[in-house]
C-alpha cells in the first residue's frame, strides 16, 4: 500500500497505522513500520499521537463516531421493532465486515482478556477486575481497558435500548434479560463476522444478513 505523501502528516500516519495494525495485530505492529509506510519522522508520530496505544485508540475512535451516528440514524428511520432491528444489523454487518481486523484487536487484545481481566458493571459505570487472584490491575491498564470497553458499549447500548423498549411494548417475553440478550446477539454477530467476514461479504448482502439475524432473533429456527 502506498500512502499519498501530499496528505497531511497526521492523516498519513493514521492510514499507515490502519494498514500495519490490520496486517499484524496490535502487539506485533511496530511504530517503525508505521513510520516507514507514512514516510514521516519518528518525532512526528510522538507529536501527534504520543505512543502506539494512543495512535491505535485514535484510529478506532475516529471510525467509531460516524458508525454510532449511522446506527442511530438507521434505527430512527423506521417505526417497527423488527424494522429497527434490521436497520441496526444492516449497518453493523457492513461496518464490522469492513473493519473486522481492527475490531478483533479491540475484542481480543485491548479488553484485558490476555491480561487476566474483565469488565463488570459498577453502578452507572464500569470497573475492571482481575479474573485470578494473582493478577494485579494497574490504574493505567484499567483506564486503557475501559476506553475500549466504552467503544463497544456505545455500539451495543443502542441495541439494548431497542430491546428494552420492545419489552415495555410487550413485544418480547417478560423474562427477557435485556443486558444478557443484547450481548448474546451483538457479540454472536460480531464473532460470526470475525470468523467468516470474507464469506459474508462475498455471498450475502448487508440487507440479507440483517434479515436472517433479525428473523432468528425474533422467531428462532422453529417451524
Identify what each model region corresponds to.
Residues 1-24, 28-40, 54:
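Basic, helix-initiating cap at the start of DNA-binding domains
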Residues 22, 46-50, 57-58, 62:
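Base-recognition residues in the alpha-helical recognition helix of bacterial helix-turn-helix
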Residues 56, 60, 64, 85, ...:
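Amphipathic, non-transmembrane alpha-helical scaffold segments
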Residues 58, 73-101, 182-185:
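Hydrophobic alpha-helical connector segments
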Residues 94, 157-169, 183-223:
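C-terminal peripheral helix-coil segments that are non-catalytic and often amphipathic
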Residues 104-106, 174-175, 197:
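Short, hydrophobic secondary-structure boundary micro-motifs
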Residues 116-169, 179-183:
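Amphipathic alpha-helical packing segments from all-alpha helical-bundle domains
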